[in-house]
Design a protein with these regions (language model features):
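Residue-level signal for well-ordered alpha-helical segments
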Residues: 18-22, 26, 34, 49, ...
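Rieske [2Fe-2S] iron-sulfur-binding domain
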Residues: 62-166, 170-173
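Non-catalytic accessory segments flanking enzyme active sites
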Residues: 24-25, 29-74, 78-79
Length: 174
């Protein structure tokens, strides 16, 4: 926004504050009730605002040091947000690649390993599958194919941002 436009708007706001008035639309605006109750509109808004853009899952201080984590499902995707052993912020779908079970049930904590409660598959805080019991039953598998699915994540402005789609991107310049 140009400085001249900012000044014009600020002068208008100051005028209303000085005169104890508010800005109105010049009359009553009627909004159809289905604006607030329509499932179709809800789905459109949900997809537009919460699935197409990065969302805040916490503040930087919510992961105070290396090997700390938090979990959330704020926007329909179970997220495991971690700081790795070097303190870098990363995020993964909090879902075991084997059977789709939630890997970490605790909301917050500090650990370097996360184990799926279903079969005990264990992941490090880099999302890698590092172990699985009963190898005689599962056979040899390519661990690289069964890690936690990483989600686009960045730490900026004091917040932890995660995109709910693995194919999404986070770009604050747009």
């Amino acid at each position: 926004m140009h400085k001249t436009e900012q000044m014009r708007l600020l002068k208008g706001l100051m005028h209303h504050l000085d005169n104890k008035t508010n800005i109105d639309a010049g009359g009553i605006i009627r909004t159809p009730a289905d604006t607030y109750t329509s499932e179709e509109r809800f789905d459109m808004e949900w997809n537009t605002f919460f699935q197409d853009y990065a969302q805040i899952v916490g503040m930087s201080g919510d992961l105070p040091g290396p090997n700390t984590f938090l979990t959330t499902e704020y926007f329909g995707v179970p997220v495991l947000a971690v700081r790795d052993s070097k303190g870098k912020f990363k995020a993964y779908a909090n879902v075991c690649a084997h059977r789709g079970v939630t890997v970490e049930a605790n909301k917050r904590g500090e650990k370097t390993r996360f184990s799926c409660p279903f079969h005990g598959w264990t992941f490090n805080n880099d999302g890698e599958l590092v172990g699985y019991p009963k190898k005689d039953q599962f056979g040899e598998i390519d661990k690289a194919c069964y890690g936690l699915k990483e989600l686009p994540a960045t730490e900026k402005f004091g917040f932890l941002w995660v995109h709910p789609s693995r194919n999404g991107s986070i770009n604050f310049d747009e």
